[in-house]
UniProtKB/Swiss-Prot annotation:
Keyword Secreted attached: no
Record-given protein name: Probable spore germination protein GerPE
Alphabetical UniProt keywords: Germination, Sporulation
Pfam families associated with the record: GerPE
Superkingdom of the source species: Bacteria
Functional description taken from the UniProt entry: Required for the formation of functionally normal spores. Could be involved in the establishment of normal spore coat structure and/or permeability, which allows the access of germinants to their receptor.
Amino acid sequence: MLHHVSIVQNVSIISLGIAAVFQVGDANQMELKSRAIAVHREIPFYIRGEGRFDAFEIFTDEHITIPKRTTDVKLNIVNECPFIEVNNVELRTLLNSGCFQIGNVDYGFNNSRIIQIRQYITDEPSAQ
């Protein structure tokens, strides 16, 4: 992995989501995961034990295909200037499991799973 010296003059961030990363500099590996269950009801009430991730198929990692890493490529790189210079970064929002990096990363894995459940008393919500 190439090594750099990252220089950032000014950073402005308004909001970072769950498991979001803003990184200046090199990283060996990054594994960002977030999971959420959002239940919207017409009449608000809480049912004990309803927020179990294993009850929903979307939260199992069995269906995620992660490519296998291969190192068959031979490189000869001359890094004449190891500096990464950035003047200004303005970031409004970085959502769940998002990554903004100034630098090098050898391996990154980002996974965000959110299920939204809407429960209404009537078949269709009233348009008032």
